[in-house]
Amino acid sequence: MLAADPASTRPRRAEVLAALSLALDLGLGQPMEHMLRAAVIATRMADRIGMDATERGVVYYAELVSWIGCQADSPELSALFADEIAFRAGTFPIDLRGRNRARFLLGQAGHGRPPLAGGRARLRLLADGRRRMHELLESHYASAGALADRLGLGAGVRDAIHHTFERWDGTGLPRGIGGPAIPIAMRIVHVADVIEVQLRAAGPEAAVQLARRRSGTQFDPQVVAVLTGAADEIFAGLDQQDVWPLALSQAPDPRLALSDPEVDALLIAIGDFVDVKSPRRQGHSRRVGALAARAGQSRGLPETTVHALRRAGWVHDLGRLGVPGALWDRSGPLSSADRERIRLYPYFTQRILGRVGGLAEVAEIAGAHRERLDGSGFPRGVDGSSLSVPARLLAAAARLQSLTEERLDRPAVGLAQAVRTLEREAAAGALDAQAVAAVADAAGQPQPRRRARATGLTAREEQVLALAAVGRSSRQIAAELTISEKTARNHLEHIYTKTGVSNRAGASLFAVQHGIVRAGPPTG
């Protein structure tokens, strides 16, 4: 993949969303540029169908973000299938209907688990798997719609991606919608998304054969006819090493440059989207960005550098989308392969962001947040001679913020204890002592009070929402607030009604957007 054009100083909307699609590819277990290649296939089919510019634009962006809800349902999906990324990757080669679907789901339930645990997972799936899959996909759609709105993609894209898992034959999930009731944009995306994988794996002839086999079952026969009637033209150029410029040329707004506030809004939304993958990380990226920026200001960095540092904090964890959630939550030892997957995530963060014109500095800072002065960090293991002041500040800010947040294997620690930990790491040569001092000072600064509630929630409901957003069950919420479990459930029902969300992920995004999730480290 080529670097972004250094002459481009204002990110373009299509570039930012194309970069997001690269991160989504990682979460699907596909190589980066899968969705970009599929978008080329989809828009070329749209052209041959005769769709107008608006409809064609819906096809393009629906293809790029059709899986945008997949991170929101990652905790629930990994509870069912252990490795949610392997599960998603496994859906492409199989026509998921009837016995094929049952065999696939049962096989995935045991995938990567010891025999006894795998057997129990299969039994749970047999007992109530259909209900849980329906709930999971409804959650996916709700979260995908909310995120699409925040990305400014419009009602057409939102409607299309609400049909991502439906099928032409009406056997899809969760609603069993079929035939022309599925928006034409999504019927095109259904074909393009699967066919790109087959094209890359086995070539044009195999891709055409697969489309014909699934015509009338998963795929709209008329869309398949368009593909098979002009396959050579539709597939042209997709075998080139770098498809980025070709895919961007198909965008409905390839030259639409964004203002600074528009870029900020997109990057904040992307950071929130990354955090929703883990209930314990809600609001993490926003807090890291704010903390790093305050530390940069205290160090006297130029405002342009502080702005880049803040942005890097918002999106520093983008590459985490390529790591199964179970690896982050595993308390036991990791295999060497699993450790390598984790060590590579900052590399993918930098590689993805580096494609966007105007974000080169952001990409460099974000990609170095796990590096250490003594060379003990990752992904590159560079030492202090290669680490800029902003990179050192972000490393300290991300480390402190993580320590003050609860994780599966440990409770959150207070600010004073977290600072002492960072000071020890600085004394050992891992973190920069000046960066640690600046971050500690910034973390101790009084933060602006959140403005008065404009959410329609009561004070108690906000307390309940703050706990639900970080993964607490109704029973845990009841225990922490000293209320009954029934009262906690009632509060959650009222919260969902008032906020217009229907699931944990939606509630988490709402809480982060409205400042209800804790905004900074605990001071104890």
Can you name each region flagged by the protein language model?
Residues 471-506:
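Recognition helix of helix-turn-helix DNA-binding domains
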Residues 160, 191, 365, 461-464, ...:
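Short alpha-helical "packing" element that flanks the helix-turn-helix/winged-helix DNA-binding module
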